[in-house]
Amino acid sequence: MSKVAKYRRQVSEDPDIDSLLSTLSPEEMEELEKELDVVDPDGSIPVGLRQRNQTDKQPSGSFNREAMLNFCEKESKKLIQREMSVDESKQVGRKTDAKNGEEKDSDASRKAPGPRQDSDLGKEPKKGVLKKSFSRDREEADGRGGEKPKEEKVIRGIDKGRVRAAVDRKESGKDGREERAAAARKEEEKTGSVKNAGLSRDKDKKKEEVKEPSKKEEVKLTAESRNTVGRREDGRLKESSKENKKPEDEGIGSGGRDWRKEDEKVKKEENQPDKEVREESKTKAPEKQAPSCPNKPSDGQARAEEEAAPSIFDEPLEKVKNNDPEMTEVNVNNSDCITNEILVRFTEALEFNTVVKVFALANTRADDHVAFAIAIMLKANKTITSLNLDSNHITGKGILAIFRALLQNNTLTELRFHNQRHICGVKTEMEIAKLLKENTTLLKLGYHFELAGPRMTVTNLLSRNMDKQRQKRLQEQKQAQEASGEKKDRLEVPKVGALAKGSPKPSPQPSPKPAPKNSPKKAGVPAAPPPPPPPLAPPLIMENLKNSLSPATQRKMGDKVLPAQEKNSRDQLLAAIRSSNLKQLKKVEVPKLLQ
């Protein structure tokens, strides 16, 4: 309200404004303060705090935190209930499978022949039956405590061993059946999900299928371990019964046979679901391949491009094979659809071509096979002058093969093989420098050597080749000039008519050998002698030339050793004047100008 007070002081002269301000409500006063803040900012407040906060707004939507938390709790409870229901359904399925297995085993034991004890052992009793049997054994032991303790102990041990073996078989059979049932249900659920789910679920199914065989292997190992334990116990029981009673031995033997038969049945039952799982996996394979078909149009497009590539390069290949005079350059740089086979076909066609001078295949994914084909082509081809192999997959072996082929090639002047996928290395660079010493035609090499030694040697060799090419060019020019001069001399023939008239003027360029037919009247007169040859230049003294090129210090040292040079006319005149006397001089009249 301080700013409003200031504003009131400023406008206190006008009573109408005071009355208006007094009638304003507090909300209107706040709005007025905001407007005054904008109109007349306070200099004492920092610049960043002078403007009102324009980001303070009321929430546009109704946000309730409690409602959101309640919703999250409900969703989490639903998920937990779903998981619990799935587990319960699995447990119920396992129980039903166990009951079915018990019924089957009881039927098999009833059919099996043998004494009563063995038939009872063949059955798989329930938990209540097992408890009753244990209680009966205890009562019998208490009642007959004084009579035949040794025999009772043996019988109890035999019964206990049989009961334990039966319990172990039960547990192993139940576990195997429960796991089989669970695996079968999972497979059924997977088949339903394959039909209904999209392509995104295929990956999860593959992972589950990979896990299933590992689980089955674990189940097999546990079942085998339990069977081995049961067999060991059976062997021990047999030995103890043989020592005590023979009839019991016979019963135990029959029971062991029954147990073996049951073990074989269990193994067969375990093998059957494995076979069924394999058959189902085979049937599922085509079903899984069917939904993955829409993901393969890219492969079809790539194949179509590869098939279309040969059609694109058929025409240039035919032109190269037929030595088309218009086809002087083969440039397939940066072509995406070209393959190594097509590049090899190009090199084979260029082997006997006499027109193409430039072969460029940069960034075409060419490998060592193409490099070896190019090496063979360079040995036979004598017209290609430029070869570009930049940005490819050629290794040191392919590059060395090309340089060895250059020993038999005298036409290639430019070779580029920079920016390969594989580094050439120290050994290949040294070999390149050695091989280039025997080549005298290569002028440009597109490669940056990593080592300083090969780099300097190659630059020196290339400059040597440049000098040799320049010398050859100069020699060719001289030979051409001499040949043209000889042709001009042969073409210049003197005019017959002018000499027949007997003109006294000689020709400006007299021929050294005049023809005898030119002057029939003067046949007896001897021919005029040819003009004297021009004077030869004075011979150069090699020592003087050496002194002129040597530094001044050496020249001073060798001045005394130099021979006397020939004197010119001025020097001779001055020497004669110095050696003459007044008596020898002749009197000469003074010219009039000097008088």
From Swiss-Prot:
- GO cellular component terms, A-Z: actin filament; myofibril; sarcomere
In the record, Phosphoserine modifications are located at S12, S85, S135, S550
Q: Name one GO biological process term.
A: pointed-end actin filament capping
**Composition bias, kind Basic and acidic residues: at what positions?**
81-110, 117-127, 134-192, 200-223, 230-249, 257-287, 467-476, 484-493
Q: PROSITE patterns in the record, alphabetically? A: WH2
**Chief location bin:** cytoplasm
Q: Which Pfam families is this protein grouped with? A: Tropomodulin, WH2
Query: Which regions are flagged for Acidic residues bias?
Result: 27-40
Annotated region (8 X approximate tandem repeats) at: 165-288
Which residue range or ranges hold the WH2 domain?
569-588
Chain positions covered by the region annotation 5 X 4 AA approximate tandem repeats: 503-522
**Pro residues biased stretches:** 505-517, 527-538
- One GO MF term, please? tropomyosin binding
Expressed, tissue-wise, as follows: Detected in aorta, urinary bladder and uterus (at protein level). Detected in smooth muscle cells. Detected in aorta, bladder, colon, intestine, stomach and uterus.
sequence repeat copies, ranges: 165-179, 180-195, 196-211, 212-226, 227-240, 242-255, 256-271, 272-288
In the record, the note on similarity to other proteins reads: Belongs to the tropomodulin family.
Write down what this protein is called.
Leiomodin-1
Organism the protein comes from: Mus musculus
Gene name per UniProt: Lmod1
